[in-house]
Amino acid sequence: MNNFLKLNNLSKKYEKNKSLKVLNNINFKFEAGKVYSIIGPSGSGKSTLLNILSLIDRPSNGNLIINKNKIDFNDVKLNDKIRSDYFGIIYQEKNLLSDFTAIENISFAGIANGKSLKESMHISEKILKKLGLKNRSKHFPAELSGGESQRIAIGRALINSPNIIIADEPSGNLDHKNAKEFFKLLLNLKSEKRIIIYATHNRFFANLADCRLQLINGKLKSINARK
């Protein structure tokens, strides 16, 4: 069965201003083997939506379904496990551990999810080779370029073989050349039947996706699927 992620009538508002909906009645289904971009101006709800999709935040109304399983946002412990098992998350800020080498940064994410050191290092070596960084495995973050560091962030997201990869403005700190290389790697992951979702303010990179979702003031205003 192919993986899917479905939003039903999903809304979000914060306690400080309950009359303002950061997300307003979002309905959509994300399917495996496809890449989705979320575009919209600052404050449109992109990051809030990604945080709910990855179970970091919770909606005020509506629900989230992963592979026919409705998420109970009150069960924090279970959701932490679901996030670890199903999701790989890439942030704009790479947040690499400065005292860890490239391979250690990747393997640490595997160990944190219950893998042995030996297994994590073995998988990390394969990932570094796949990302074209085999010869940078012993380098520390300060010795890596911005593009290399962001590829390590991809590797860290991949080590637990996630079904869903979510990235929030992942190329925001990269120049155009490195950003293009980053998105080439990211988009290639869909061949492994994953769901890839990323938010960006850059229309060029948004248009690389199979489907582009536009958020305006918390509402899903348009859906443009590549034919």
Task: Cite the ranges covered by each PLM segment.
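Conserved ABC transporter NBD signature motif
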Residues: G62-F73
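Conserved ABC ATPase signature
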Residues: F140-L144, E148-Q150
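Helix-to-loop junction immediately C-terminal to a conserved catalytic motif
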Residues: S54
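Conserved signature/switch motifs of ABC ATPase nucleotide-binding domains
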Residues: S84, H139-A142, N160, E192
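Catalytic Walker B motif of ABC-type/P-loop ATPase nucleotide-binding domains
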Residues: I165-D168
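Short coil-to-helix segment of the ABC ATPase nucleotide-binding domain corresponding to the Q-loop/switch region
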Residues: F100-F108
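ABC ATPase NBD coupling module
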Residues: I71-G88, S191
